[in-house]
Amino acid sequence: MAKDPSFDIVSEVDMQVIDDCVNVAVKEIDNRFDFKGQNIQIELNKGEKTITILAPADFVLNQVRDILFQKFIKRGLNQKCLREKKKEKAAGDAIREINEIVHGIDKDLAKQIVKDIKDMKLKVQASIQDEQIRVSGAKKDDLQAVITMIKGKDYPIPLQFTNYR
């Protein structure tokens, strides 16, 4: 007999898509008339999984972040995949914002998701496996109900479903 149907809940981001979004945003910022002559930088560090934005003022920083988020939306990325790590003063009056790219589900959120699944009182098992959650059950309908519930809730990171078996 075959194993019970299952799927994994993960939070993954394609770094190549983020790299493309950053490059397109940098090109748009370089071509915008209202940003001419200003020291604005967006840097992607793939090793540390961070995006650093440098802007001369807080207002400009917000505009640059909005441009970056527009590029994320066009490419189908959720803006929840960026978490502000720290905002600091840079040289002169400039402001530097370091954003962390969320990758994987942390333990506290994983426990909350498993609790939410168990509160549904369906015959499914949810187990935390490193930075993902495996959900298995006898009926595919129960698994689909779990997916619907998770999509309906607003978690602080984007979640995807993989490894349907």
UniProtKB/Swiss-Prot annotation:
CDD domains: YajQ_like (cd11740). The keyword Nucleotide-binding applies. Gene3D superfamilies: 3.30.70.860, YajQ-like, domain 2 (3.30.70.990). GO terms for molecular function: nucleotide binding. Keywords: Nucleotide-binding. It comes from the Bacteria. GO terms for cellular component: cytosol. InterPro entries: DUF520, UPF0234-like_C, UPF0234_N, YajQ-like_sf. Pfam families: DUF520 (PF04461). The keyword Nucleotide-binding applies. Nucleotide-binding protein. Belongs to the YajQ family. This is Nucleotide-binding protein BHWA1_00627. It comes from Brachyspira hyodysenteriae (strain ATCC 49526 / WA1).
